[in-house]
Amino acid sequence: MSSSLILIIILSYMTGSISGGIIVGKFRNIDIRKKGSNNAGATNALRTMGIVFALIVLFIDVYKGYFAANYIPYLLNENTNQAKILASLGAILGHVYPLYFKFKGGKGVGTALGTLFVFPELSINIVIGFVCWLATLIFTGFVGLSSIIAGISVSVAYLLNNNTLDDLALYSILMSIFFIFTHRENIYRMAKGKENQFKKVMIINLFKKNE
């Protein structure tokens, strides 16, 4: 691996370490990692700070993934898919294990989403992933499960559409596996029947309101 690719990973990791949830929480005198699900992502920001702050957190997390994957390789004259994928991985790792916040961050979903916008080949897969995420959410109410299903659907859709195990296929597969890892506590709580649900968005509850 060249020195420029290593530098891309390092700079992307440092960019990913800028945690929207923790920074926004400081303006509210809240350590988001000690509230709700103890996670620094947008979902916990919604639970603990409300929708406006959650949207700000989501924007920061998504954009830093896009910035790292799109601009850092370009600035270092390594504007290839390989460089962009390495930058993407660096940013996601930075979000989950932020250098500036004692390596305790979010679960990487928003940042990973931001990286996907850099690859035109994944455009339709983003739509498929969102549809699967939304469908899972309104039927189950579990955001963590929705994120896992979305990640898996992106990788499966790419493989089915392209029928090749190229760099982007490997990246999408690795991303979906990593989502399962970062949501392992959610999976455990779901198995125990203790996972929090967003019941307001569940389709069964929407029908009940209209009865």
Question: How would you describe each model-predicted region?
Answer:
Residues R47-P73:
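Multi-pass membrane catalytic core of lipid/isoprenoid biosynthesis enzymes
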Residues D31-A42, Y100-L113, F142-A150:
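Short, non-helical or kinked segments that cap or interrupt transmembrane helices
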Residues L46-M49, I72-L76, G90, G94, ...:
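Interfacial segments of multi-pass membrane proteins
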Residues I8, S12, S17, G21, ...:
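Alpha-helical transmembrane segments in multi-pass membrane proteins
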Residues N125-G129, V143-A150, T164-M175:
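Loop-to-transmembrane alpha-helix initiation sites
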